[in-house]
Amino acid sequence: MAEPISNPTRINILGKDNIIIDHGIWLNFVAQDLLQNIKSSTYILITDTNLYKTYVPPFQSVFEKAAPQDVRLLTYAIPPGEYSKGRDTKAEIEDWMLSHQCTRDTVIIALGGGVIGDMIGYVAATFMRGVRFVQCPTTLLAMVDSSIGGKTAIDVPMGKNLIGAFWQPERIYIDLTFLNTLPVREFINGMAEVIKTAAIWDENEFTALEENAKAILEAVRSKNKSADRLAPIRDILKRIVLGSARVKAEVVSSDEREGGLRNLLNFGHSIGHAYEAILTPQVLHGEAVAIGMVKEAELARFLGVLRPSAVARLSKCIASYDLPTSLQDKRIVKLTAGKECPVDVLLQKMAVDKKNEGRKKKIVLLSAIGKTYEPKASVVEDRAIRIVLSPCIRVFAGVPKDLNVSVTPPGSKSISNRALILAALGEGTTRIHNLLHSDDTQVMLNAVAQLQGASFSWEEGDVLVVKGNGGKLQATSTPLYLGNAGTASRFLTSVAALCNPSDVNSTVLTGNARMKQRPIGALVDALRANGVGVKYLEKEHSLPVQVDAAGGLAGGVMELAATISSQYVSSLLMAAPYAREPVTLRLVGGKPISQPYIDMTIAMMASFGVQVQRSAEDPNTYYIPQGTYKNPETYVVESDASSATYPLAIAAITGTTCTVPNIGSKSLQGDARFAIEVLRPMGCTVEQTDVSTTVTGPPIGTLKAIPHVDMEPMTDAFLTASVLAAVASGTTQITGIANQRVKECNRILAMKDQLAKFGVHCNELEDGIEVIGIPYTELKNPTEGIYCYDDHRVAMSFSVLSTISPHPVLILERECTGKTWPGWWDTMSNYFKVHLEGEEEPHSSHVSHEKPRKGNPKSIFIIGMRGAGKSTAGKWMSEVLNRPLIDLDHELERREGQTIPEIIRSERGWEGFRKAELELLEDVIKNNPTGHIFSCGGGIVETEAARKMLLSYSQNGGIVLLVHRDTDQVVEYLMRDKSRPAYSENIREVYYRRKPFFEECSNFRYYSPHPDGSKALTEPPFDFSQFLSVICGHSNHLEEVKKKPHSFFVSLTVPNVSKALDIIPKVVVGSDAVELRVDLLEDYDPEFVAKQVALLRSAARIPIVYTVRTVSQGGKFPDDDYELALKLYRTGLQAGVEYLDLEMTMPDEVIEAVTNEKGYTHIIASHHDPKATLSWKNGGWIQYYNKALQHGDVVKLVGVARELADNFALARFKASLAAAHDKPLIALNMGAAGKLSRVLNGFLTPVSHPALPSKAAPGQLSAAEIRQALALIGELEPRSFHLFGNPISASRSPALHNALFRDNGLPHQYSLFETDNAADVKDLIRAPGFGGASVTIPLKLDIMPLLDEVSDAAKVIGAVNTIIPVRNGDKVTLRGDNTDWMGMVYALRNAGVVKCTKESPTAGMVVGAGGTTRAAVHALHDLGFAPIYVVARNADRVKALAESFPAEYDIRSLSTPEEVAAESTAQPSVVISTIPADKPIDQSMREVIVASLRHPSVADGKHVLLEMAYTPRHTPLMQLAEDAHWQTIPGLEVLAAQGWYQFQLWTGITPIYTDAQAAVMGN
């Protein structure tokens, strides 16, 4: 043991030196100090289960050596996390203490983070009316904040820390050594409180935090496994903790009970706690406070007490420690599964803040970094808070009439971004004044820092000090994420080419979804032509791109198309001095766009010491010398002229006066001309000096249109001009703005669409827009709100129009103005006195703008061995997806004009064939990226370049599908096939050589379970359609299951699916999915497992839950074989399973790989605790729930019940989570005592089945048993079902349905209700307990007016035989359907009838023209039969029947044997009889029927007669058919089948058909 520490650092609090700080004091000081100075007979050390093993035993050892014999040390551990900090845990600890006879002299040692300190302090404050305690904080957060000051508390449902006491600890022992083992996220979490303290108290400390961020994060993130990973920042750490602790101690000593000054320590907490109350426990306290600080600083800015630069500085400092600054932070979205924080709920949470005075909310407002507005929290009205918290803002008209204001816009975005690049590339230090503090410039700062181009620091709050590295940049392995910052993307693409290789040889630039649509092709072409390697990683001509670290451009002559963006030109100009020889830059392709911005770049380069010469002969040619930028001592960024158009436009539109004091005629920016060239012609008075611009608008409503204005020199300002033109008298035509289509959005279209919401009509021009103005009093109310496309200029432009709109205007994306003017709404409120209100986004707003379409529209490439079934799979796919199928072998032959054998036999040979094949693949990938299906030749994977193309395609969202079936079958088939070139080597060897190539290139695999030539191959089999629906994203199974009150998956416990095919259809009855327990299979070979999935999908016909359960989680798979586990997970994903069970105990890299590759498979993130180490009563499960919430679409937690009460604890746990998150949760207990939890689980409960060899888990029940139990406890209501009609006394329907209800554990009853009057059942079908009804003659038509809706089939047939009550909450909709035709189709298919194809049309026939005939016609049409002959006595009825169906049904009458003979080429192969069997057949009809049955053409093939009558069971017509050698189906089959379908529609359960059949037949 180390020497005891004799003199650690101490801090005085409340007059005593009770805060003790140093390294190593836990084991070398604390025990001795306690025993000497805080004496007791009983010490209790309380910590959490994570810390216990590491820190408690060594302390016990030290303590026991030093303690007298009559002194005892007790220890207790609780689960970690905020969930434990509640009434239940407090009571548990107190009961335990009482059971150990703890008395008033007890001293409690709270070892842990804020949760332990807060709660154990409260236990100490209340146990026996108060016992002594000491704090031993182990987290940075607790060291600098929660352990100091005596605030103790627990959380309650209304919020954090609402029940507690002030109870000062006797000592606070801060051992900095604890921080060595603190997880990275927890350390960063604590930095939020450190930043908070500096922000309110000490700017010097804040500056130190800014400067040390990189060093601190590097140390904290160090992979160094030694005990002292934080050694490099040992002194910094002590300074940070000492500094924060001293501030807190000083404040607490002045204001122990939080009368005023101590409020200041709550900066960031008023809003932060509200976020935390909603997002806990997934978001940590410091993370919530970090977002809260930004929001509260924005609030101070809105109220006019804090400068925008201070907000930006605070936000940047927080972000530099990897803390979130908004709810949109990707980590927050992932941690909380995108949980929303409604503003009303936040305000409700804030209403119970302890600082408040009654209903007045109090918030700490900053006035500068290191200083607060008042020495206490300030009262702030709800309206202001709501604006800052809301995603949208409503603008009310009403600028004061005589307003005359001076507004200074933020620094120019264009100049700011150029200045950052030039300063970073320059040598020396420069101070940049008035830099724009915005999202875009932040992106640029972060990127330049990432490339090690420069170091940055801040002076006086808003002066940026840049120390450039003279162009010495390093490539980075972390992609530069640029969001939607277009300027940054263009400038940095060239800058990335200046980088030197580091541990990587290239840099990736990427951005958000919109950025990936914006063009960058012309710039990339110019760089490539100059020797820089640039690769597109997704879409051609857009980000993401990978730029080689070329160490600079080659130089010489460069050509660039500059008609789309002047930023391409500026990008190359700024990088050119670092080329290996001087650059001549020629702009080609027409007149360059936005010439003033090119001039701006050249003028700024001169300020940084590089002179660009413009050619006298060709003004579009520039000469750039080699050189290094020399940074000026200071550089002042002009205000943004584009942004200045908005305040000036408000003056113009409202008839008031506004001055922009620092933009005039000598501005570098083209948009400075806006006032002179746009506002003056519109009727404004404009005064412009060299450096300032003043605009006074004409009387409101009198702006004049400008017939034509060319805005090419100031394209960004066209949006401002457009909203003014909207209320000007006449039509305004704006041209020269073509580049605005490829900005943050298509701005021209955006203007047109959003102005239309005001009733203003616009016409798009080739390079502009025409706006037809209307009087402002006639502006319509844009009720859905104005969608801003995440475009700052759209938002600000429409805020201008809103200032005179007769209706308040909702602008949907308030925060997007942060890109160039973060304080724009503050400016509107404080300068223009515009009334604003914050609002949530309305639910309807999504209708008016794009949302991603469900499903994957990308083209599909099918690969696989010749003979594996690619062509067949392609045909199925084409039919299911309704996409064209192109066989690339056939397409190659078509393009080449030769067959493949001919190409191979020619001089081109195999090499020439493979080259042509590769070129074709490249062509179709490029030119047919969506909506197609391509079947590739088997050998395409032999070419490495083709493999790379296919692999790249699959990795970028495309589908490459490997089709395979039993290898022996493939080989046998190829031995027979003589139609294609023979293999020159053994077929099996070819397959095994290609197999790894197939697997490498494909991201999905279909293993066909269908033997060659099986009947299923004539149409897409069910298993293939199901597979396709998953991989293409069309399956909505999870959404459907979520709507059910009770759903199940049955756990299959068989070692080989092929040996259980006979029981699987029975086993899956009543379940919504079937679980394949991969860990229980006899072989873990991925190919064997893929075959098991295929066989199961084919046999079960329901979605698959794919599970690899490890030994420690209650399964059989080895715990530590992570490599094989990942292979098996990938096998499941490639097989397109609907659900994959992913254990949260797997290593993070396995979890990340599976979640990244999941496609449209839903992840069930699971944790099982078969050894019962966790309890539902405390927070033990929360860490697993939090992790599952991040990675799963469904969360599954399975514990063990030792007694019935454990199920009630589980129920309470589930209820608390359900209130916080809507992610589906499976949570239950194993064991006999846990059966109740299975009954009550509700969502996808795992079940067994009596036919299975074993249960997958102890205590598992069948679905039928659970339904029986639910009925017994009143959770499953008994419902009444009926048959309506007359006569019905002999019906077999009650026998059918009551048998199926009984077999499936349902408490329902089916009975007869005999009537021939529909009115008799009107009340019955609306009764609460009505479950559904069958309808027969004579009510099939009469019942329809009593229903709310009718299925399409029932409409066509004109009859309803089934009533289904569709329940949606309390609302019940009665839906009518017809299952007669479904029963007919099923009976025919069961008899072997297959669907007709367009290639081989077949006729069908219906006998009779009564009510059932229509269903028979529809059934035959559904099976593809055409023409459909009808044989009946009354030709007029047949004619009327034919006319009532759509023409494509092709219904024809047959009335004589001669007509039968005349139709010799289209004789029916299927006949459905709908005539009664208890009367003789009409003679004329009999002759026609016999002629058809005995026609010579029917000697070949399958011929089936379906008899609809079932009394008698064997009818005369059946005898006629059998005499002619036709197969016959008795009427009871259809009765059974239509009833079987009715049962499915009512219950959602698909029983075994033979069970329904047996009930009908009376077996």
Swiss-Prot record:
Relay the cofactor remark from the entry.
Binds 2 Zn(2+) ions per subunit.
Could you provide one GO biological process annotation from this protein's UniProt record?
aromatic amino acid family biosynthetic process
> Quick one: which residues bind ATP?
G864, M865, R866, G867, A868, G869, K870, S871
Where is it found, in Gene Ontology cellular component terms? cytoplasm
- Localization annotation: Cytoplasm
Where is this chain primarily localised?
cytoplasm
Q: Which residues bind NAD(+)?
A: 48-50, 82-85, 113-115, 118, 138-139, 160, 178-181, 189
User: Where does the record place the region Shikimate dehydrogenase?
Assistant: 1278-1563
CDD domains associated with the record: DHQase_I, DHQS, EPSP_synthase, NAD_bind_Shikimate_DH, SK
Give the start-end ranges of region Shikimate kinase: 857-1051
**Which keywords, in A-to-Z order, does the entry hold?**
Amino-acid biosynthesis, Aromatic amino acid biosynthesis, ATP-binding, Cytoplasm, Kinase, Lyase, Metal-binding, Multifunctional enzyme, NADP, Nucleotide-binding, Oxidoreductase, Transferase, Zinc
Q: Which PROSITE patterns match?
A: DEHYDROQUINASE_I, EPSP_SYNTHASE_1, EPSP_SYNTHASE_2, SHIKIMATE_KINASE
Task: Give, as in the UniProt entry, the pathway in which the protein acts.
Answer: Metabolic intermediate biosynthesis; chorismate biosynthesis; chorismate from D-erythrose 4-phosphate and phosphoenolpyruvate: step 2/7; Metabolic intermediate biosynthesis; chorismate biosynthesis; chorismate from D-erythrose 4-phosphate and phosphoenolpyruvate: step 3/7; Metabolic intermediate biosynthesis; chorismate biosynthesis; chorismate from D-erythrose 4-phosphate and phosphoenolpyruvate: step 4/7; Metabolic intermediate biosynthesis; chorismate biosynthesis; chorismate from D-erythrose 4-phosphate and phosphoenolpyruvate: step 5/7
Give me the ranges of the annotated region EPSP synthase: 395-834
User: What does this protein need as cofactor?
Assistant: Zn(2+)
Does the record bear Disulfide bond in its keywords? Answer: no
Q: Which residues form the active site?
A: E258 (proton acceptor), H273 (proton acceptor), C816 (for epsp synthase activity), H1168 (proton acceptor), K1196 (schiff-base intermediate with substrate)
Instruction: List ligand-binding residues for 7-phospho-2-dehydro-3-deoxy-D-arabino-heptonate.
Output: 129, 145, 151, 161, 193-196, 248, 262-266, 269, 285, 354
Q: Which residue ranges are recorded for the region named 3-dehydroquinate synthase?
A: 1-382
Q: Where does Zn(2+) bind?
A: E193, H269, H285
Q: Which reaction does it catalyse?
A: 7-phospho-2-dehydro-3-deoxy-D-arabino-heptonate = 3-dehydroquinate + phosphate; 3-dehydroquinate = 3-dehydroshikimate + H2O; shikimate + NADP(+) = 3-dehydroshikimate + NADPH + H(+); shikimate + ATP = 3-phosphoshikimate + ADP + H(+)
A single Gene Ontology MF term assigned here is:
3-dehydroquinate dehydratase activity
* Primary role: The AROM polypeptide catalyzes 5 consecutive enzymatic reactions in prechorismate polyaromatic amino acid biosynthesis.
Concerning its family, UniProt says: In the N-terminal section; belongs to the sugar phosphate cyclases superfamily. Dehydroquinate synthase family.
Listed under subunit, the entry gives:
Homodimer.
Quote the protein name from its UniProt record.
Pentafunctional AROM polypeptide
Lineage, highest ranks first:
Eukaryota, Fungi, Dikarya, Ascomycota, Pezizomycotina
